[in-house]
């Protein structure tokens, strides 16, 4: 009888979760065949939720671990997993999607757009959201930038009456641009955070080796996707934001200060979680200036990432030999491809564990990881945020992983070319 190690079972569950993400549309269609409210319909809709996938398979793995050993072993394993990043994403997503923060962002973008000739306003609004916001992710963190960009683009692009070509091409470019746009600094992009301390990468290093290249690619990607959808975007009317003019400055400033404190100490869950509880109290006493917090959406995204971290920690046994055996170009292509099926932060973290990795190999590993960050929902930690916020604009309230993958190929290739040749 063949026996599997714990690592191998974790990889089987990981592979099952990856396949499951590509089948969510199938589960959604199957659910529609059953009476509404029935057990089968609810169960299939549950399986069709992208944010649930990795948490569900992680639960299956923990169940197996409890069965072959005992429940204490599963608890000990969970205690060894670092859930700081999922917790941070939950907190920053809930904060960044509040009414005062969004009102400030909407006011800046729409105000800048209104200065342009009327015929160019939609283009300026779109390009500002697709270029400036991803690059701001280098300073406010990628998850916060993803929330802002997704909510800015939602009323312009992600409505059900827009074409599938527009929605998927813009979503793909948004994911790629957020992934590479966070590389101007060493403290914003998850795959960079994982290696910056171990390899001594500071702000100057990131700007000189990644930042300027990625900024160019972000602009090129945004302009190309605009030109591809020029006629449809031009016909879209600018969103009308009701609350931005009436938001007091002190209210916006208080939210920005809370976010700044969380971002500054994003590596300390013991700090930012109590601070978030303080923030919840603040939003309650200032409820007249608030809209309902997106706690459900934020928790689902955190659950997805928590499952990814739980299973991803045990993938070292097969990823590390691949990383250590490849030449630079092979490693670059391999890292880009591997990012599609594993979180890019987990991939770069495993790179820090490979002894004797050359400086060139370090660069191409991270370059490939960020370039491939838009290929799938699991490729980059902020991606589930966009899916969670924008999926209502897609048929069946579900984003097709295959359509997203196909739409992301060209912007990913452009990112690879920029990081390899520039």
Locate the predicted segments by residue.
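Transmembrane helical segments that form the transport core of multi-pass membrane transport proteins
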Residues: 68-71, 75-76, 102, 255-359
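Hydrophobic transmembrane alpha-helices that form the pore/transport pathway of multi-pass ion
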Residues: 124-180, 194, 349-367, 390-409, ...
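Transmembrane alpha-helix boundary signature
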Residues: 62-77, 92-111, 135-147, 313-321, ...
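Interfacial loop-to-helix junctions that mark the boundaries of transmembrane helices
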Residues: 1-9, 42-50, 71-86, 203-213, ...
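Helix-loop-helix module between adjacent transmembrane segments
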Residues: 93-101, 119-120, 132-144, 176-185, ...
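Hydrophobic mid-bilayer segments of alpha-helices in multi-pass membrane transport proteins
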Residues: 9-29, 49-67, 82-94, 148, ...
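Long, contiguous bundles of hydrophobic transmembrane helices that form the permeation core
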Residues: 220-264, 271-276
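Juxtamembrane and boundary regions of transmembrane helices in multi-pass small-molecule transporters
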Residues: 2, 6-33, 162-168, 172, ...
